[in-house]
Amino acid sequence: MALNLRKNHQILKIINDALIDLPAPSNISTWWNFGSLLGICLITQIVTGLLLAMHYTADTSLAFSSVAHMCRDVQFGWLIRNLHANGASFFFICIYLHIGRGLYYGSYLNKETWNVGVLLLLALMATAFVGYVLPWGQMSFWGATVITNLFSAIPYIGQTLVEWAWGGFSVDNPTLTRFFALHFLLPFVIVGLTLVHLTFLHETGSNNPLGIPSDCDKIPFHPYYTIKDILGFVLMLSLLVSLALFAPNLLGDPENFTPANPLVTPPHIKPEWYFLFAYAILRSIPNKLGGVLALAASILVLFLTPLLHTSKLRSMTFRPLSQILFWTLVANVLILTWVGSQPVEHPFIIIGQLASFTYFTIILILFPLAAALENKLLKL
């Protein structure tokens, strides 16, 4: 009998084991679609980004006009740019939902997969930040200035570190050039990390909504979940194309239509919407170093979640107290996002401080306490 090429060819075998014959739990819901959606986001961003890089000029005197030229003179350049800019927003929507799913269903107990996932989030945030600087508009320039300046809060080496990152004494041409180089490089780092993420995931297999082992009831990934994923792709890409065609500037800052000017500071310097929650945490602490530490902690706290799991049940499906806390945390992050977009004045300052305090309290204190209490109530 002839060998089945799909199952025996060195390379096809890897693809087969990851996407076709992969044993998957029979009951995973739509919340498990976001991993593949993130893969589609990554591919879309790399393809559109490559096409944009072919027309972009990484020079302070030409960057802004090269982006304008792309939108005016390049065939479908406006579409490619709008897809790329809004694709970033969809990337973050998907990753935040993906992380939320992981927190709710206890997926973080696959420790290696989770930790690589947090590294992926950090890499994505770095990529988005350096990418936002490239059009060299007002918010690009001042965003870069404000965020890179945070490193100067590091004791002793801070100022040297910032000037080394800038390549001079302010954000200027060398900064733009290196940010373009980093923005080109980092997505490929993300691809590499994604493969590591999947390798670790396929060691243990997917979690499921019940949070119980599903070895006794597995189904092949293809055709069941390939079809389910394709439905997700169609829905997400429809939304992305609709946003890029009907409201391409909805999520952008009007300030970025003005070329960068080091002599004029915009009235409200704020990042893109997907960083606002972290920006609100940064601003809520009146000390520079303290703010930077809180900003870092807001993301790095995710590394601690596997260590803070005190429940005897993996998922929150049967844990009503933890569910209430989880949805409170979601509402809290939305409040932080809103506060981050507001000016630094009363009452936003105190709201931001309370929301920042609540964010860390829920994750570090209330989640473990509620889980321990549920163990008692359920006599586990």
From Swiss-Prot:
Q: What is the first-listed, main subcellular location in coarse terms? A: mitochondrion
User: Which molecular function terms from Gene Ontology are attached?
Assistant: metal ion binding; ubiquinol-cytochrome-c reductase activity
Give GO BP annotations, semicolon-separated: mitochondrial electron transport, ubiquinol to cytochrome c
PANTHER family (UniProt xref): CYTOCHROME B
Q: Which SUPFAM superfamilies match?
A: a domain/subunit of cytochrome bc1 complex (Ubiquinol-cytochrome c reductase), Transmembrane di-heme cytochromes
The identity of this protein, by name, is Cytochrome b
User: Which sites bind heme b b562?
Assistant: H84, H183
Q: Name one GO cellular component term.
A: mitochondrial inner membrane
Key word Transmembrane present in the record? yes
Any extra detail in the entry? Heme 1 (or BL or b562) is low-potential and absorbs at about 562 nm, and heme 2 (or BH or b566) is high-potential and absorbs at about 566 nm.
Amino acids binding a ubiquinone: H202
Quaternary structure and interacting proteins, as annotated: The cytochrome bc1 complex contains 11 subunits: 3 respiratory subunits (MT-CYB, CYC1 and UQCRFS1), 2 core proteins (UQCRC1 and UQCRC2) and 6 low-molecular weight proteins (UQCRH/QCR6, UQCRB/QCR7, UQCRQ/QCR8, UQCR10/QCR9, UQCR11/QCR10 and a cleavage product of UQCRFS1). This cytochrome bc1 complex then forms a dimer.
Co-factor remark: Binds 2 heme b groups non-covalently.
Question: Which keywords does this chain's UniProt record carry?
Answer: Electron transport, Heme, Iron, Membrane, Metal-binding, Mitochondrion, Mitochondrion inner membrane, Respiratory chain, Transmembrane, Transmembrane helix, Transport, Ubiquinone
Binding-site positions, heme b b566: H98, H197
Q: Which residues cross the membrane?
A: 34-54, 78-99, 114-134, 179-199, 227-247, 289-309, 321-341, 348-368
Its topology with respect to the membrane?
Answer: Multi-pass membrane protein
